[in-house]
Regions:
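Substrate-binding groove of N-acetylhexosamine-processing glycoside hydrolases
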Residues: 3-309
Length: 309
């Protein structure tokens, strides 16, 4: 059924556009015997795109797949790597070393293609997933993945990751240094979207930590402004004031930051994308803090009124 569908599509498109060669992501092809693929007639006008996104590729397994495609009658093969998006459906921050290793592994495969004389390597597609499918949440935003894209592209162009490669990457991005294991970059950056890159970094590194620190490490909140106190709208003003200024400052600092962050996002993304990303990555952390501040402001005005029923 699959090959029949592909044959119909190939026949139609090559009839409309003579000389066109179609690229087929090879998921479905891997389980189909070489002879069946050959007899389908699709190999004359199509090429498989062999994709793996893990850091350490099984080159022996990939070699077997390439051999099978050569036996199937394909004259060319493409590969597909990833510079972002494949490390988790809700990933916020791109792990640089993971994607660098993926490309270094693909370089080994590319450099070994002489072992397959009947099938020619055509190129590699660097994928940058935005979602895992139409129903999943957003993974890394493109500005967050641009340093990884530069890293992976330059590694492919230069045939490896060397000091010279690193220097070129830093020049392109406008950074002073790049830390692969920590997935961080030093400097302001000069690439389009660098402001968003740094703002997302702040959300990723600081928001959850700062919000939790206020909510969980402040014993006065636990002792004198628990959920029970908040539900019944009472509290001792003296105890509330011991943490109130810190609570409000933390909240207002983040609210001020997020106003500017939203403006930056809206200059690049559609409104629904902005709303979704903030809902998934910011509000989930900030909402408990926002609710606590709201309750604090209401209860402190009651000036020690006894517990409501």
């Amino acid at each position: 059924m699959y090959l029949g569908h592909i044959r119909e599509v190939v026949t139609f498109l090559t009839g409309q556009y003579p000389g066109l060669r179609l690229l087929l992501w090879d998921d479905m092809l891997r389980k189909i015997p070489a002879q069946v693929i050959r007899e389908s007639g699709i190999t004359q006008h199509a090429a498989p795109v062999l994709w793996f996104y893990t850091p350490d590729l099984d080159t022996e397994q990939i070699g077997k797949i390439i051999t099978k495609y050569a036996e199937s009658g394909f004259s060319t093969v493409w590969f597909a790597s990833a510079f972002k998006g494949t490390t988790g459906p809700a990933q916020m921050w791109t792990p640089l070393n993971h994607h660098l290793k993926n490309h270094l592994s693909w370089l080994k495969v590319i450099q070994a293609m002489a072992k397959f004389p009947t099938i020619q390597y055509q190129g590699i597609v660097l994928t940058g997933w935005q979602r895992y499918d139409h129903y999943s949440v957003l993974c890394e935003l493109l500005p967050v993945g641009i340093p990884s894209l530069a890293l992976c592209l330059q590694t492919l162009v230069n045939g490896g990751f060397t000091d010279t490669t690193k220097k070129r990457i830093l020049e392109l991005l406008g950074f002073q240094n790049i830390h692969l294991e920590q997935s961080t970059c030093e400097g302001t950056g000069s690439f389009p979207g660098s402001e968003i890159y740094h703002m997302v970094e702040r959300v990723n590194v600081q928001l959850k930590e700062k919000a939790l620190k206020v909510l969980e490490e402040e014993s006065a909140i636990e002792g004198w402004f628990s959920r029970y106190h908040r539900r019944h709208r009472f509290g001792n003003p003296r105890n509330l004031e011991s943490f109130g200024s810190k609570l409000i400052k933390t909240f207002e600092d983040w609210e001020s930051f997020l106003q500017g962050f939203r403006t930056r996002l809206e200059a690049v993304f559609f409104p629904d994308t902005v709303e979704e990303w903030l809902e998934e990555n910011v509000n989930v952390q900030l909402e408990p803090l926002r609710e606590l501040v709201h309750d604090y402001r209401e209860v402190i005005q009651l000036n020690g009124r006894p517990k409501s029923r």
